Swiss-Prot record:
Keywords: Acetylation, Mitochondrion, Ribonucleoprotein, Ribosomal protein. This is Small ribosomal subunit protein mS23. One of its GO terms (biological process) is mitochondrial translation. Component of the mitochondrial ribosome small subunit (28S) which comprises a 12S rRNA and about 30 distinct proteins.
Amino acid sequence: MAGSRLETVGSIFTRTRDLIRAGVLKEKPLWFDVYNAFPPLREPVFRRPRLRYGKAKSPTQDIYYHEDQIRAKFYAAYGSGPKAFDLFNPNFKSTCQRFVEKYIELQKLGETDEEKLFVEAGKALLAEGVILRRVEKARTQQEGSQVSRKSESMGVESQTALEENPPLKEVPQAQHLESPGEESKGLSPP
């Protein structure tokens, strides 16, 4: 049993105790008498971890603020926007933060309808000079411009436009910066 590696059968104390009784171990380990005098409240026995299916539940609850719901609505409607966060400026406020502040300011004035508050906060930012573009409209405009390009390429109107403006000549990919009189001196071109 000494070389069986059955760590799962019992605790280290019970296995050591049995080895001493069988005469395999001649001397007691230093910790054996201490463990015997002060046994733990729960015996340390190996247990296989249960298989978990699905997402593991976190022991802490997520903290949501009212502002987070406003931000989620803002990003769903307007996206992150073209302007990046300026992390070097400690007084920088993102468009979303300015929107949330306007939303809360209008809410304190007594408005209760969330949709109306959302629209009014957008209008207030527009009055300050911040232009908000809805994500859905931008996507449909891009798709619409692609469709119009495809339809134009098949029509006669685009052919006449090509005849008026001849296509540009292709520029070679590898351009040498050497003057015509200079020869390359055994070096391969870049």
